């Protein structure tokens, strides 16, 4: 069947109106191609009288009224499967790494339904990250969804890079990284880091373990809105082959923001704080597809920017509902020089349950949180009256809490070049042993600076000898 042909009748920034014959009107999400150009338009609204409103997935420079447009009659499709490994692609699956075309033998549409309820597979298995604070208070589930929440400059991307370093490199499965509206420099650094560590095999790309999809912050809103779906489609294809996939998204907030821009351009009435009225639905459509089935699993780690450090902002608040573990990064903790700046009282995990992690882990985590909470309550009294006015048991709780706080810090492998101290991977058993000793009072004689930026508790004892 010949492709339906239309003409551009209006072009306002990234929004392009196209007129077709009334009986050939494209469906919502159909991909339209420009004559003599690589630009793709995606249908968002049917305005009636054969006119559709579309979003340009690329720059709309040079478009003018009267240009010819063809309807492909299908959703945007992107290459999936082994051909994507070791490659950097854009929202349409076109390569941007200057290593030749991507094999298009296997393709899949970026819009599809989430798996049915009876296909889903819940998981109780823990995923060890080697980061003490995460493994202790907000453990990750294999096949679960994790959010890294934080304002500007508290370390979301560095934490994500460390998780990739600790999990993806040791992980026998495959990883997909979707860079949604983030800095191009970070995408470039990530690629070179993956190449240096062998996760991207430059000699034989098919042996690589990661596929990368980028729609960075200099791209039009259409690209940033759809690039998460492109990455997810590639991850789903690996999952449906029966593999265990790690899916990293940096940053899910930019996905929301791109939706806000597109919504405003389409003329929709904004809702709370200027967000799109379809925020919950758009987020749900993406998040419900990121799931594990009986065939394979997707473990997803998403960075979530928190505007003005306000966790009640509609965007992070909508994301919270979909996650199994939430890692909240705090500016107050970062200002103390404690990195990773994870707030152990705000961060949560569904896995922190004695039936899942075991009684020992659960009791240690709760004792650590209880000690830190007591310190938080006493801080006002200390600020007004000083430490000397506290009861002896409260003084002891404060001393232990300060040691715990410092022991929650850890040198990262990915930050080695900045800090000069080698990164540490701490096993879950060592993490529990260390915090158990501090809570039990076995380290009361050590100075608190011995606990700062060390790996295991044995290193703290060694450091104490030098202090």
UniProtKB/Swiss-Prot annotation:
Subcellular location: Cell inner membrane
Catalytic activity, as annotated: ATP + H2O + 4 H(+)(in) = ADP + phosphate + 5 H(+)(out)
Topology class, membrane: Peripheral membrane protein
This protein's UniProt keywords: ATP synthesis, ATP-binding, Cell inner membrane, Cell membrane, CF(1), Hydrogen ion transport, Ion transport, Membrane, Nucleotide-binding, Translocase, Transport
Biological function: Produces ATP from ADP in the presence of a proton gradient across the membrane. The catalytic sites are hosted primarily by the beta subunits.
PANTHER family listed in its UniProt record: ATP SYNTHASE (PTHR15184), ATP SYNTHASE SUBUNIT BETA, MITOCHONDRIAL (PTHR15184:SF71)
Quaternary organization: F-type ATPases have 2 components, CF(1) - the catalytic core - and CF(0) - the membrane proton channel. CF(1) has five subunits: alpha(3), beta(3), gamma(1), delta(1), epsilon(1). CF(0) has three main subunits: a(1), b(2) and c(9-12). The alpha and beta chains form an alternating ring which encloses part of the gamma chain. CF(1) is attached to CF(0) by a central stalk formed by the gamma and epsilon chains, while a peripheral stalk is formed by the delta and b chains.
Family of the protein in this entry: Belongs to the ATPase alpha/beta chains family.
Name the UniProt record assigns to this protein: ATP synthase subunit beta
Protein source organism: Polaromonas sp. (strain JS666 / ATCC BAA-500)
Gene: atpD
